[in-house]
Amino acid sequence: MSIGILGKKLGMSQFFDEEGKAVPVTLIEAGPCRITQLKSIDTDGYTAVQLGYGETRQKLVNKPSKGHLARSGEQLLSHLREYRVETIDGLKLGNSITVEDFKAGQKVDVSGDSMGRGFSGYQKRHGFSRGPMTHGSKNHREPGSTGAGTTPGRIYPGKRMAGRYGGKQITTRGLVIVKVDTGHNLLVVKGSVPGKPGSLLNIFPAKGVNSKFANGGK
């Protein structure tokens, strides 16, 4: 049973399948993640598993977090995530979740922070078409009309305009695991995932629209 796992994006590469075709893949260094808390219906009203990832220093962890982490082990961790599960039977505080819980061919969702691009214009942020470049035109990269004048006399909320682009948490769904390397704690996932190399990723079994067909189901 794969609960979920935290990891770090290493970068993209290519993988050759059995037919010799090159498949674009992302390398993710996932886990090991320590079970830091088990939640049950009796104590919390629902069942869940909390995992910790990423060793850190004493000065970077506050006193309440140190007490919380001390229940499951000595090493301090910098990232905590919670995963809902149907049952916590067989799970124990301090145990590790590794890539061995995943298998090739399994579909997963990958969540992370997208690459921040700062304040960006209409073309870069929303893919607007540019204006004419010649014949006296002066509106090469301007947006054009943003609405009528007298009525409504304002710009509607949600209008696509220039602004901060990227740096938000997004989820890429239905990615297929091509290979699991237990020796190096690697998940090789087909396609791209959010974030830049070195950023934190949350990997969990596929949910949502494709959940019916995820993980080999019919």
From Swiss-Prot:
GO biological process terms, semicolon-separated: translation
Compartment(s): Plastid, Organellar chromatophore
Single GO MF descriptor: rRNA binding
Assembly mode: Part of the 50S ribosomal subunit.
Record bears the keyword Heme: no
A cellular component term, taken from the record's GO annotations: plastid
Pfam families for the chain: Ribosomal_L3
Name the record gives this protein: Large ribosomal subunit protein uL3c
